[in-house]
């Protein structure tokens, strides 16, 4: 039962809404928790035990850290400044050990389930004989969403340790934060402070929230079923049989995958955020017109925003203020100059971020390469920044002009397409093969000689994708210029507004990729 399924949208959600509204206000959060666990069980069965275990551990660590903080406050009463400092340091060490224990257990479970086979296979190749053979049962499955709720759990415990939030005292509230059903499969990866204000209120359903929620859900379905599922046919054909293709066909498939991935992932986010909106719950946005980005750094501030924000908060910032970086900054300012100091500092802080980004996506070398690809590009951007600024000034080029911005956006599109080619490829070796064949054997004639019609899509399919992309692009452009489309629609006359709503639904029914020749496509990010 995916978010795009008929069962979810027309059965699970309405039943949940009905029971939620009937329940007393103080019990509505527990109703959502019950439906969340039912949803997870329908997806992963007995693997629900992993989510329950993570919830129990996270809650206990949060309480433990709170107890340590209370003990610290009591211990420093009446002490002098030096004594207070010594006592606080001792309790901070206790807190760090407790936090480290929680993180170690969570990452240990995730690593064992998701990465154990990857490490054993590569170690076996390295040493020339089987390593740790039989340590992992063959039928051991990975629960859906574990990569998402593990990060949320680590973020929650860390925020409690930092003192930025208070630990929950009622375990059902911790459980709902980690397991709220709309976000369990694909995120967004919310911080506790992002959702706490609306997650537990239990307020009654409101007409405006229900309408806005379902409109957003159907907008997500449009992107997923009309565009992404259609592009998947061509993309899967080329990437699964990459040795049979070259040149422009590979380029077209890489571009197609960028379209597929964005339309599916952002479409699912629309469904997820819309599902939360039905109950008056505000989940964080995960996309902000990423294809308007002028460089890789900006792209990642607009793409999968909550993942980037998590890495920034819990890896980048802690490394940036670490003792190693502080010592380097002191040394670098004296001996190496401002630019080199900044370059090395950025490298130290960004390297673990991009390693983690690659590894988080999956246990394959092409995902690790994908992370390093963006790390290198971002570091190159920082390295050449003084030279670039000098050239712009010498040539009297205003970087804010539309022409220059268009060039930068086009350059970023090329970077994105190449990166996603390796991301989608069936392994790093396959990615290199496809990339080399795309460059060496490029033939633009393949785009017009009918070759593209042999990849599973007909002319009408490509036309539907193009029109769909134009519609999504226009809406995105309006949002980029500060126009809130849904609010603008609310200003329209009721017949016009509801006419547009029904047009969206009819468009999905007519143009969605289903029926003969089409296969139901699994959610891409649910596999991570």
Report residues per predicted region.
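Membrane-embedded transmembrane alpha-helical bundles that form the catalytic cores
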Residues: 1-527
